[in-house]
Amino acid sequence: MTDFTRHTPETAPAAAKPVLEGAQKALGFVPNLYATMAEAPALLNAYAQLGELLNKSSFSPTEQQVVLMTNNRLNGCDYCMAAHTTISQASGVPADVIDALRTGAPIADAKLEALRQFAITVNETRGWPTQSDLDAFFAAGYGQQQVLEVILGTAFKVLSNYTNHVAST
């Protein structure tokens, strides 16, 4: 595969510098994903902004990780799965939920399992859930807002998972 450039805050295009500098300050390092995305500042900035928007969604941190880790697994992104395992642990996601998300096993919590199943459906149908898929999601206590937020989470993971695939981060 092509050896993609991994930028530092010093080598990044000007439009990418603020995100890399923010990551360096917050984490103490620049993740390889960000360093790679910096080559296309629009991608890096879109990814960072989508992440901020997802954090403002109606989903709890655990629900966010259900959507994100489900997409990581379905998209075969080991890098993101490892990163989100660490994020999930730091966010207080129960260990049994993390294990289920990593392996694709059902989650014991019925509402979280409904979310996982719906995230699978959105990913595998490329956004074409059936009415019965929607009805099952609604019956679990979710609404139209959460349908759209699953799409947001799925889009967020497409950016990172696909970047990791082509750049082998």
Q: What are the language-model segments listed below?
A:
Residues M1-T169:
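Hydrophobic alpha-helical segments
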